[in-house]
Amino acid sequence: MKIKIQKIHPNALIPKYQTDGSSGFDLHAVEEVMIKPHSVGLVKIGICLSLEVGYELQVRTRSGLALNHQVMVLNSPGTVDNDYRGEIKVILANLSDKDFKVQVGDRIAQGVVQKTYKAEFIECEQLDETSRGSGGFGSTGVSKA
C-alpha cells in the first residue's frame, strides 16, 4: 500500500518502519512541548496523509515511553479516518510526577494502518440470549495474580 504524505512543517519527517517485521512506524514531533506531571499535551507531527478507502491510521503508545517515562497516547489507539486531510497530532498524557519534555524529532507515538469495515445496524426488539447475558465489568472473574 502506498500512502501519500504532505509535509507541512520544515521539521517534519516521513514515517518509516524501523525493521522489516515492524507493524508500526514512528511518528516524530516537529516542535518542543513540555508536558507537566499528570497533564496532557498536544504534539504536532507536521504531516498530512491520504489513506486508501477502507483503511484507518491507528496512533498508538510507544512501549518505551510508557515503561520508562509513564507517557502514553491518551486516546490510544487514536483513529485517523481515511477522509481526514489535516495535520496529524498526538495527545500525550504524562502520568509521572516529573515534567516530560518532547524534543524536535522525538519518536512520540507509532502509527499502524488497519483495515476497516462498515457495519449495517439493524434495529430489533430483543437480542439473542447468551450465557454471559448483560454481565459487565468483572463479570467473568477477576485474576488472582
UniProtKB/Swiss-Prot annotation:
Catalytic activity: dUTP + H2O = dUMP + diphosphate + H(+)
Gene3D superfamilies in the cross-refs: 2.70.40.10
Name the record gives this protein: Deoxyuridine 5'-triphosphate nucleotidohydrolase
Enzyme class: hydrolase
Organism: Helicobacter pylori (strain ATCC 700392 / 26695) (Campylobacter pylori)
Listed cofactors: Mg(2+)
Enzyme Commission code(s) on record: 3.6.1.23
A GO biological-process term: dUMP biosynthetic process
PANTHER family given in the database record: DEOXYURIDINE 5'-TRIPHOSPHATE NUCLEOTIDOHYDROLASE
Pathway(s) served: Pyrimidine metabolism; dUMP biosynthesis; dUMP from dCTP (dUTP route): step 2/2
Keyword annotations of the record: Hydrolase, Magnesium, Metal-binding, Nucleotide metabolism
MF term (GO), any: dUTP diphosphatase activity
InterPro entries (alphabetical): dUTPase, dUTPase-like, dUTPase-like_sf, dUTPase_trimeric
UniProt key word Ribonucleoprotein: no
